[in-house]
Amino acid sequence: MNLKLFNPLILTSLTPLIGVFILLLIPSAKEKLCRNFALWISCLTFLFSLLLWIQFNSGTSFFQFSTTFLWFPFFNLYYTIGIDGISLFFILLTTLLIISCILVSWSSIQTNLKDYLICFLILEFLLIQVFSVLDLLLFYIYFESVLIPMFLIVGVWGSRQRKIRAAYQFFLYTLIGSLLMLLALLNIYFQTGTTDLQILWYIQFSEISQIFLWLSFFASFAVKIPMIPFHIWLPEAHAEAPTAGSVILAGILLKMGGYGFLRFSLPMFPVASIFFTPFIFTLSLVAIIYASLTTLRQIDLKKIIAYSSVSHMGFVTIGIFSLNIQGIEGSILLMLSHGLVSSALFLCIGVLYDRYKTRVIKYYSGLIQVMPLFGVFFLFFTFANLGFPGTSSFIGEVLVLLSSFQINKTLTLFASLGMIFGAAYSIWLFNRIIFGSLKLGYFSSFQDISRREFWILIPLAILILWMGIYPNSFLNEIHFSSVNLLELISHT
């Protein structure tokens, strides 16, 4: 056993779980205490995750803060966790956005508040494990366990009448895709006798086995991203989820599929990954163009951002399967950027919904006149969403396009069209909401963002600018892990 309790990764992992057990002891009637305690636990978890970044050695591709112990002796299964440059920032993004989720729910959740907060702390624990476990079986367990609290968040605390249908749709779509992954996992275990990721990376499966296993993993990861045509559940889940649910869904859950491709599909099944690259590129281009055009037809603000997420994740999958350093690093940066930008936009939509109880775009116009601070934030985040220079999305998209240009110039051309469509729906969105004449007939009063809402949005804005102006502070941490991934692929 190699277990150090003062390991920052152990502290980051266990803090939300300990918080759950303590929160269970607090009476449900003491809502203020429940809120404050959950907030302090989430802040403490974030501070521990910052220690990971501070102590992280960017000059190596090895897993750091590793811990291993035997958890299932009969099958010789070990519980192993550790992080590299790929997983580091996903953990940081998770711990940051959980704070935003708790703060944005401060006054909007009126029923079963303690249970709601417990769901988010459990979700935080599960997501940290997803990004840190180095065992295929453990990854699968946590990967699927995330569905349970998310199902409850959408189905119990959703904002509209179709929330139950949306929750079941989300649950069933993702579960069915993952059943194939379970069969593949069992096949791998019976072939190799292990589920240790660091051993599986160096086992050469036959080409036929790789194709079968890759497709099984693809079925699970493609639903999570989601790729066309597995995206049907996403707009409905976003439309029905509470604001915090949409933040965690867009900010973190969609990244689990991309992370799965990077951590498992590419290094374990390199031959199959190369074989299916044209297939992935085709689906990605369809996602970019179809989702961008569909976005222009939406009237629900949440569905607009949901479809734009499908388009952005199309760029991510192009970058991942470009199989070069610009593509890998660009896709990771783009996922991190999308996690910040889409979360910020959903938070802005939540600001409007909390005040006016509608997300239908036709009711909004000229808000810059009565909500100037909100208007500035919404304008900035919308520009970040379209990939404006100086924002985080710009760097990620440029790296992805550079990577695709090395492979197929036609692919790059059509992907660039997606950026043009993205600019079109982004400009249309903020022009419709922020500018124009104020529609006084629909609302009796207007209120700009509160101090609490300001402090939720400003850290996201700062990070988006930081990533856009000084991307090397992130790329340097990612680089050696990305190089190591490409070396694993090249050893076929």
Swiss-Prot record:
Its main location: mitochondrion. The chain crosses the membrane at residues 9-29, 36-56, 63-83, 86-106, 115-135, 136-156, 170-190, 211-231, 242-262, 269-289, 304-324, 332-352, 370-390, 410-430, 454-474. GO terms for molecular function: NADH dehydrogenase (ubiquinone) activity; ubiquinone binding. Signal peptide: none annotated. Core subunit of the mitochondrial membrane respiratory chain NADH dehydrogenase (Complex I) that is believed to belong to the minimal assembly required for catalysis. Complex I functions in the transfer of electrons from NADH to the respiratory chain. The immediate electron acceptor for the enzyme is believed to be ubiquinone. The gene is ND4. One of its GO terms (cellular component) is mitochondrial membrane. This is NADH-ubiquinone oxidoreductase chain 4. It catalyses: a ubiquinone + NADH + 5 H(+)(in) = a ubiquinol + NAD(+) + 4 H(+)(out). Its EC number is 7.1.1.2. The keyword Transmembrane helix applies. It is found in: Mitochondrion membrane. The lineage of its organism: Eukaryota, Rhodophyta, Florideophyceae, Rhodymeniophycidae, Gigartinales. InterPro entries: NADH_Q_OxRdtase_chainM/4, NADH_UbQ_OxRdtase, ND/Mrp_TM. It is a multi-pass membrane protein. The keyword Isomerase does not apply. Belongs to the complex I subunit 4 family. Pfam families: Proton_antipo_M. GO terms for biological process: ATP synthesis coupled electron transport; electron transport coupled proton transport. Keywords: Electron transport, Membrane, Mitochondrion, NAD, Respiratory chain, Translocase, Transmembrane, Transmembrane helix, Transport, Ubiquinone. It comes from the Eukaryota. NCBIfam families: NDH_I_M, PRK05846.1-3.
